[in-house]
Amino acid sequence: MRHEKASDIWAESEKSAAISGMKKIRLCFATNNLHKLEEVRAILPEEIELLSLQETDCREELPENQRSLEGNALEKATFVYQKTATDCFADDTGLEVEALDGEPGVDTAHYAGPERDAQKNMALLLKNLEGKPNRNACFRTVFCLIWQGETYSFEGRIEGEIAAEAKGSGGFGYDPVFIPRGYSQTFAELGPEVKNRLSHRAEACRQLAAFFKTAGIGKM
């Protein structure tokens, strides 16, 4: 797997904020999480047409059996590519909390149990942090892209801290308890416009878009 370095990508991508002069690129986002799908659609430039799993007739549960974000993203992307023969990418995201030795990490989505209940996940996280002064945390998102038979990976991250209690009604997942560094409000309070500019997933999306620009793929 080729891992695209953020520094290399940003050096080129900063020359232009948009992917100008590119043909439409069709990609399947290998996720059953509709919140993620809509968030990524809002972030990626219009030159990238994002297909849902349903639009590729892949309606099966995606495998997620690895013990790393990178492994899970690769497993899901490979599964969808083999099923549909469609260029695609998958993601896995983890919240890593310093005082909990990196937990919940790869278990972020099902921290409190297999039902993937966001409210229960946040409640358990806040309980486990009771009495701990260090609330530093980071969100990491890893994208695995399979494009024309080649595999690439991109990583976005954002530092911050865990709030004392859940605040805000926006977003999804752990957004009500994650305060990005430099801010005093949670992602859920800040709203989608701010989150989609700052977040770990936004950074990974920018790297993905910049990959197509710098690689010359799709240029007219």
Predicted regions and their residues:
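Alpha-helical and His/Cys-centered functional microenvironments
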Residues: 7
